[in-house]
Amino acid sequence: MAAQRLCASIGCMSVHYESVPLGTLYPEAFGIPAPLEALERHIWPRKPAVFIRLAPAAEPVVPEPDLLADPGLPAVPTGAAVKGVRQLQLGQFGLVPPWVKSASDAKLRSTKLVNARSETVTTTTSFRDSWLKGQRCIVPMMAFFEDDWRSGKAVPTRISRVDGKPMGVAGLWEHWAKDGQEIISFTLLTVNANSHALLHRYQQGGNEKRMPAILGEGTYDAWLNARYEKAKEFMRAYPANWLTANPVEGKRLSQLDRSIA
């Protein structure tokens, strides 16, 4: 099946998530208007989706020290930053580095660049430039999907917030242009989940467990505005008691699997 082949090729971390539906959730959760057109509900590599980035201004600003609204998460790092406002951008899920030589090469590479390890993002060739240029973003989603292998078979599981609200996942974006073609793309940043009370149960045994770097709601502006040398301080595992996991029904799974291009 297509999903299994994809997972085998890239390690099957966070390759599939559920987009935020149109309506009031975008302004309520992210302080921006909703997209003008509905997105596909299930987002896979190379599918179009939206992310939130910074529309920069010129003057420097120091973020407020009390931006962390969620209790239980460590304090937000502060420091001089570039002032800007949030901007919703349509892009491809799966980052295309600026040095890619052709659109065909971009298609092949982006499928494997849907996740960026936070520990090595500053040194990995595919993501380093985006990180150093401060091209950070927030990826809105209702849930992400991971396989539960505890029964010996892969059971896709939907992982969402306990309160049902959207999540904002830390990401990077990039703009690729060559020979009259342009691709705006993004990737999800991930953190280690070996010791996470919930996420350590998922993905295949014997491999390092990973999870998306979910941001606290009060940290969105600080994440987008922080200097790159401070940005890694936002890479933390989201509290397990704020998340819930529910298996996906088999009939629905077959429909999801066919959605991979």
PLM features: residue spans?
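A glycine-rich, hydrophobic loop/mini-helix early in the fold
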Residues: D70-R128
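Conserved SET/PR-domain catalytic core that frames the SAM/AdoMet-binding pocket
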Residues: T125-S151, G218
